[in-house]
From Swiss-Prot:
Region spans: Disordered: 219-246
GO molecular function annotations of the record: ATP binding; ATP hydrolysis activity
Gene name of the encoded protein: ycf2-A
Name of the protein in question: Protein Ycf2
Family as reported in the entry's similarity comment: Belongs to the Ycf2 family.
Compartments reported by the entry: Plastid, Chloroplast stroma
Chain segments annotated as transmembrane: none
Keyword line: ATP-binding, Chloroplast, Nucleotide-binding, Plastid
Positions with a binding annotation for ATP: 1308-1315
Gene Ontology terms: cellular component: chloroplast stroma
UniProt key word Plastid: yes
Amino acid sequence: MNEDTNKERGTIGTVQWRWGERLGEILREIKNSHYFFFFDSFFDSWTQFNSVRSFIPIFFHQERFLKLADPRIWSILLSRTQGSTQGSTSITIKGVILFKGVILFVVAALIYRINNRNMVESKTLYLRGLLPIPMNSIGPRNDTLEESVGSSNINRLIVSLLYLPKGKRISESSFLNPKESTFLNPKESTWVLPITKKSSMPWGSRWWRNWIGKKRDSSQLKGSSYQSRDHLDSISNEDSEYHNQREIPLPEERKIEEFLENPTRSVRSFFSDRWSELHLGSNPTERSTRDQKLLKKQQDLSFVPSRRSEKKEMVHIFKIITYLQNTVSIHPISSDPGCDRVPKDESDMDSSNKISFLNKNPFSEERFQEMANRFTLSITEPDLVYPKGSRFCNESIYRRIIKKWVPRGNVLENLKRTQIVVFVSNNIMEAVNQYRLIRNLIQIQYSTYGYIRNVLNRFFLMNRSDRNFEYGIQRDQIGKGTLNHRTLMKYMINQHLSNFFLKKSPFDSLIVIEKSKNRDPFAYRYKWSNGSKNFQEHLEHFLSEQKSRLEIAFDQFQRNYDKPLPLLLESIASIGLQIVHLKKWKPFLLDDHDTSRKMIDSFHTRNNRRKSFEKTDSYFSMIFDNQDNWLNPVKPFHRSSLISSFFKANRLRFWNNPHHFCFYSNTRFPFSVEKARISNYDFTYGQFLNILFIRNKIFSLCVGKKKHAFGGRDTISPIESQVSNIFIPNYFPSRTIYSIADISGTPLTEEEIVNLERTYCQPLSVSDRNLSDSEGKNLNQYLNFNSSMRLIPTEKDFPWKKPEKRKKRSQKRKKQSPCLPCLLCLCLKKGVEKGEMDRRDSAFSFLSDWKDLFQTYMPWFLTSTGYKHLNGIFLEPFSDLLPILTSSLSSCLSSSLSSSLSSSLSSSLSSLSSSLSSSLSSSLSSSLSSSLSSSLSSSLSSSLSSSLKFVSTFHDSMHEVGISWQILQIELQLRLFHLSHWKWAFQFQWDRLNKILNWINWISEISRKCMYSRLLLEATGMIHGKNESPLIPTHLRSVNVRELLYSILFLLLLAGYLVHTHLVFVSRAFSELQTEFKKLKPFLIPSSRMELEELLDAYPTSEPNPFEFELVKSIRSKKKYWNINLIDFIPHRITLSRKMSHLSHTSKELYSLIRKRENVNIKNANEDGKIDSWVVNSDLFVEEEFFHLLYDRTFMLTTKKSIDPILWSLTHSDHLSTHLSKNDSGYQMIEQPGAIYLRYLVDIHKKSLWNYEFNTSCLAEKRVFLAHYQTITYSQTSCGTNTFHFPSHGKPFSLRLLSPSRGVLVIGSIGTGRSYLVKHLATNSHLPFIRLAVSELLNNNPKFRWIEPEDSWPVFDDLLEHSAYYENRVGDGRDYIIDTIDASDDIDIDIVARGDIDFDKEEELLTRESDEEKKNPVRVQEKYRAEQFEEDLELAKIISPCIIWIPNIHDLNLRESTSLAAGLFVNKYSERCSTRDILVIASTHIPQKVDPSLISTNRLNRCIKVRRFFIPQKEKHVFTLLYTRGFHPHLEKNAFGSITLGSSAQDLRPLINDALLIGISQRKSIIDTNTIRCALHRETWEFQSHPKWVPNSQILFYQIGRAVVQKVLLSNCLSNYLIDPLSIYMKKRSFAGGTEGDSSLYKWYFELGTSLKLVTILLYLLSCSAGSVARDLCFLPGEDRIKLFENEMDSTLFHELLLILLEVLALESPLMGSSRTEKDCSQFDNDRVPFPFRPEPRKLLAIQRFLSEKEEWELAEGKEEGLLQPPQEIEGHIVSAPKIWRPWFCLLDGLDRPVEFLELGYPYCYGYRSFEGKQILFDKEDELEENDSEFLQSFIPRSSDEHGFFKLNQFIWDPPDPLFLLSTDEFPGSVFSYRELFADEELRITKTKLRTFRTRWLSKKAQKGRLELLINRQRWLRPNSDESEDSLYSQILSEIFEYLKNLFLSKRGLLDQTRKVLFRKRWVFPDEMHIFFM
């Protein structure tokens, strides 16, 4: 049955193999045939399309996209293509990159702009900028906000605007109320401040106009000018005025506020949910740019607090500050004097619609960071900042910080403070003082949360009757126009102050409200009244009333300053009563506004409530811990330092470690929005665009190394871009130029600077200058954009305006809707009259300076903001267009195009159908003549199916003719295959054509509506006069419409080109299909079949020469003849032509076609089929190997690298570069350096960089490619980094000179996961992976069956026959062999080069070897195995690049049978004959046994050690196993490490499976620590026998006693490292026989998981004795009968521990001292982990004797001769290996172990494993060959190997299975004395003969003396047992007994309680034990 199955499988495999060959032939013929030219061009085009498509995933990946923008990568790619031999490939790649890439980008940008402008709306047109900046949309007043927002289809791409429900409108208070307003709610994803518009109505009665508009009905175009004016959406002329709108009723206002307060609403932001934008106020008008001399050195500062009166929690002051930032104008502060431009006078400041205070302190921003953090520290930890009981000195905080952190001599020492305040109001300084006082108090109150909050709330004593108390500042104005500026300040009335307010009858309010005498009666002025005089009195009285512990010290220092610098210092002590001390009033005025404004940042997060500043939680600690970081966040307002330091640094740092930058997820700046969940690896470069100025609208993002998304302290310079329509204020050109110069890396020239100023800071347009001042201000506020942004319509934009007198006529004509032809004629006429358009009218005017703009904007595109913007531009539109492009053909074809196309295709199909009607079935003909649009695909599929049916019939009929007809069958299949491919190509092109036509229809619809609107606009403009403004909406007059029209025109032209191309291809596809059908016709003619059969019989096609494949049997000569051309052409062509003259042309064509195909087949066998031919025709492969190789054929086919994988490898970020990473579970994972090196090595091998040769003069190539090697070769130098020394003069060299290892030896103990690591790397590398199993070479049962020697040897005789055949063939074809050798093959060149091969000598050698093989069949077996091994090596060479893995490589030299294979491996892998693209990874757990020849320089020259998992790695592994199964772990912090200590990866899996079973049985999805403890207990205890419930309370009390002692004595040291849970389950065999009695106890799995440095040995002694004492106290009658360690094995353990204690007391030294550190054989000394070993003997005498012994040994070796083998060659067998290290064997280093241990049942399971490399003594009578097991049981071990453990400074005590015996038998020997169990005579049994497993390492002459040394050393290491020690033992035992006795008697109730719980629950966990002791 098996043989039949194998035969059937072999037949199937052969058929599959042949079919694969035929398929390859078909594809080759498709490529080479001349009539498939168009088909080949189609595939070429399709390949190019795939290349372009491969770029699309790069756009979705930020790191790859940013790296792709580096021109160095493009230079590398182009250089690689230039160096290629195929010129066409280089041209194709360049064409794809240049042409199609540009087309893709342009089309994507245009589609984005068209789609996101919301063009196709009902009779309206909205314009959107490239960036999602909210514009002024015009709409009627009575439209609801939701309808306005809903009308736009790009809300998800623009800045999200929260909208109202239907029927509700926007109210004034919804924007002014921070509680109600959504813009101030930090829970929302986006805050947007609406664009305000000035009105002459009172400020309290206005509402925010023109925030979001609604589409205008077309009826508005026909309405009156009054209607248009009523909605304030047009600008008629210079005398136009804004009309006021009606107030919204109060009830509706309240509804809107309630709606806006709803925190559940959220709208997606443009930058996804990770980002948030904050758009702040507007910018001053043109007057700020005219005269900038008066206040050139001053800064603009403004703030307006706002608050709802109903709120009682001061934490909402955050919203107040947020609202202030939205409504104020924050001008950047520069450290360079003269760089800032501020408004000249107050009227200019009025234009900003905000209150502006001027205060100049150029260095205040540098001081803020230190002051803020010092201020934070003074509040949270005052004892660390100031001495106890001391007051604040008169020196500023900044001075103290300078002394502490900043070196002396800083330029800040010469700081001179200047204060210039220019206001007409006399009391404005008092207003400033009062505001700052209130603001600072608010900040203090918010920062200290509940402690100061209840106190400082009561400072604001106001009139309680005024619920919404308002006060404002009225500023006088200079110049024309009056703009009323008011701000609201709402403070609550503290209800708790009512009593205090009534008591103080003459109470003077701190703030006195008085009406301003200014022109605006609605403005209030506030000033300090007399209340300021007694402020300190009231404050102290109030605080004394409240018994506060607050101290607020307001001091001033007077040194080094001309004017006093006021500071605000406050300190809160954790303990003690402090007094309010207010020395002066003016110190409330802080030094600068930024300090007080940003003090709140230090206390923003909840983490700052705590006393400690952790690095992961506190921003404060990060600043001072990383002060030297090159991205220094301490300088918050140096807006260029951050970017300049980044770009001035080594840029390769970002390539090597791209994750150095990340974001802050915790909100820190007052107006940041959300806490985004951002991991460290989400982004590449961080956020370098911190503050983006859109006029004065700012959103702030931060850069840093921590995990938070935002940090308000870090601000950098804005990088503006014309593409993103970011406007730089007029007062910023110098700073902007400086920033861009830093970013670009090269300074800008003067011409570029001038161009930059002209580009970014253009003056206002002519229309703005001509308007009056008030109109100009209103215009600026209305539009909120400068005209240089191409969004403000100016006179240049409307040169066709008519005079005012033609206004009425234009209105009349406007009422008539002009027809489209009339509009077109008018536009053309006007275009002729105009001649040429102004340069500003061009939509692409910036293209003229594209070079300068590209250089300027390129850094911005490399930032994350730029990437997000480009990502949204080029990728988001495709998702919108996808439904449109996939619609049906009938809905998109225009009438004309569809008719013409249908007619042409129908004619083609009809002609094709008529030509095929004679040869094919009627069903095929009828199907092809059906309709094109409905059944084209079905017709072609039916034709293919009918043709296949015909092939089946033809195959059946021709089966009896002969094998030659198979060629005709394959040819027919080839034609049908061509037909199917053409059908597929046609269908694909037709689908693409449908999509393009659909797209054209969509564009046509847009262009039609847009063209109509545009022509309407043009015609209307021609009708109106020059001085008359037409009644057309503003948005219809923008020049962006022209840009849209040009874009549509471009897209239409592109669509036409695509349609033309596809139509041409479709027509050619039809013609090729027709040709293919014609070629099928001759196969149906019987006469042609007969003629062809006759021709094939006379002239058969040539067959491959079998001589080639017979030579494969030779090991050396297999590869020589792969490239032999075996094509034998017909020699007599004239005779052939004469004999073929009577044949028909069809038969000749078929014969020619068949011969051509056969020639191509044999020719290409040497190219990509030599492996196939070799495997198929070779006799060396048995049947199993043959099918195995056929199955793995896919790995043998080598492919060339194309542009896609190279580009992917260059731009792909290897996340393995970070040695320290965070996994999903939050556990820190430290990867071993050896594994990191191996990962990088495989990664470089995968990226084809192994042998990449380049010229060192190319800096880009050098840096990019050597960046990989810099990370993997860092261990070669002592400092940990590799310094490359490149050859000079630009000579090319190979990267192999930089020592990437070609062979790696991975060592590690069993269970460390060596094989898992290698297989994982091989899987991720996507390279062929070959496993050379050495174990198969050691197998005694080979794959072929050997027969007995006296019988015949058929297999051997067969080999001899092949050898004889080889000898005969070689003698005949000597010259032929030498001439046909391929020079590229790696063969023995010396033999071939001589040319005089002695074939007679070769024959004699073969004959001699044959005779020897007959005599020694084992040799034949070994040779056969070596040949198999060599075949694998040859296969690796063929399919290289690949990875070879050789597990257990130490077995190559252990036996004679592997010596030949080892030699072959060394020879093949030598430097001379090995290939360069093979990575060999060998692994072993016994590195001492590896052959030294394998680890030479050119072979396995790199050694990597794999250690056991660290606890974080185990946790990650466990968490992964649990999460993948749907369970959630909930483990204690330290308990997991104690539970799984010593477990390997293989052990964790069954442990987790058991835990899951327990969780399922308990019906819980959360796996906690106790569940894993139960699983571990079940796994370890129930491994040997089934559990049984034990009713014996004696054993239970034994366990309880031990647990109580551990909890009482060791709880402080063990923490969570407690014992395994108590269980009442016992071993079944404990009560089975009854003879043993209570011989087995519960396994004490984790007895003492702690450090010896924390717990003394005495605690261990107490723990060992606890069980016995507790049992005896509870069950033995009478206290006089209590005996310690009676008949228990505890006595032995106790005894050994007591010996250690005595030894330590004698030496008076620490127990273990400093442990030695492992010397890793790898080169990662810098990253090694301390690995404690067995300590040396502690007795000084023993150490001294050991040294003398060593000297004597060396002396004896020097005298003696004839050593057979060195001692290091001794080896031992492994019997068993422990999972947990047993510490007492380490501590009892040299103590002899008694034989009675084994007799008592003590399992010596650690012992045999530890004897590797050690001497093994055995009796004389034992024989190794007889019984190895008996031999292993007969010897006595004398030494132990090093037993390392897996956690530093901790060890685990794991007494193995059953440890404590409760039998009644007497213990042999005295407990209190230690007798000598070994006499000298016992050791002398080995004196006569000493044997080891293999060979003796002692010389015959030196045995006697060395045995004496061994015996003496055993004596030295034995402890002395005298009477003094016995007395000490007895004393310690009695003291221990008394202590434990008193302990248990005092806790008898606890013992009983534990017993009851244990009987009831059957489990007692450590945490439950903790409850008992509480």
